[in-house]
Amino acid sequence: MNNNNNFNMNFFNMNNNMNNQFNFQQNNIQCPYKPIITNTNIKDINESTFINSVLQSLASFNCIYNWIKSKNQQVLTMTQNLKITKELYNLFYFLYSGQFADSSNFILNFFNAFKYKYQNINLKQDPYHFLFYLFDIIHSEDNSPLNPNYDATILNSQSLVTQRNKFSMRNLFTKFLEQSQNSIISNNFYNIFGHEIKCNNCPSLFYDSFKYIIKFKLDDYKKYRDEAYPNKKNENLNLDECFECFTGGNNSQCNNCGNLQRKTFISFVRSAKILVIALIRMNHIYKCDLDFKNKYNINAFLEYGIANYKNYFLKACISLNNQGKYFSDIFINGFWFRFYENNLSMLNNVNVEIHQYEPQLLFYELEN
């Protein structure tokens, strides 16, 4: 995909809902853009389906659109250090212009490094690893410290793990985020967690961590749920149970004394504007189907004192079909659309059509 210096920037006049560019129409329902495609110069087209599904899902968020829009004055002077940002700009420029966006250049510049890093992964988890890797790179390229007196030693401060004063920890993480994490990724996708570790032999220890993506290990969660509630063995997991397993107290070995009765409790200190949930299925013993809602509230899992407004709605879902290919279902302008390879269709029975395949990634967006 060639980047033309004489861009027609009219598409940047689109409003935040991107309502004035339409390429698909069915029963008077319109969709603002076409599927991302991959040309045949990619050796294995099947491998590109999870990449295109992730990119298509990200493109549906207004924060990504506004970020790309803000780059229009910078893109002509982007250096080699911003290679991925530049390729994303080129790709999303075509997408937001109402054209077919070809991901070939993006994949050729990115895919080999990704495959090398994750060469031993389970292929069914590719969207999760790819998104995590992409977030890392975009964050690194977009990161701009706000404070000119930023102290880089904060990044490696041992007090992030060892300091036991909860409020000092919080202040340290706040400073860390403000000074070194000001990017499109940290501003919209970072979840900050508080971990309370309780051990019979050691003092309680509180520390923070942050993650782009919440990972639910469905096989383990179903095993825990079934052992705790044997009468539910024939029932699907639901998202509430997954959050309970993720945040609840699971016995593990204490890092300090080796006590096997240690329990770890996790709470959201800050929840992201866009909550990305990876559904990991190993399919060893438990084959896990998951029930999830289009609207969700995580108030029960927030740290005490946080404002009671964390209501999310399902914006996008990436799934794997019976042919081993990925597709994305995206909620746009009040309707659900399925993007699969070069095809775009509207979903009529959303509750059935979204749940009939194995979801791999769920994208929940915070309600205004």
Residues of each region from the PLM?
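UBL (ubiquitin/ubiquitin-like) substrate-recognition surfaces
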Residues: 2, 12, 21-368
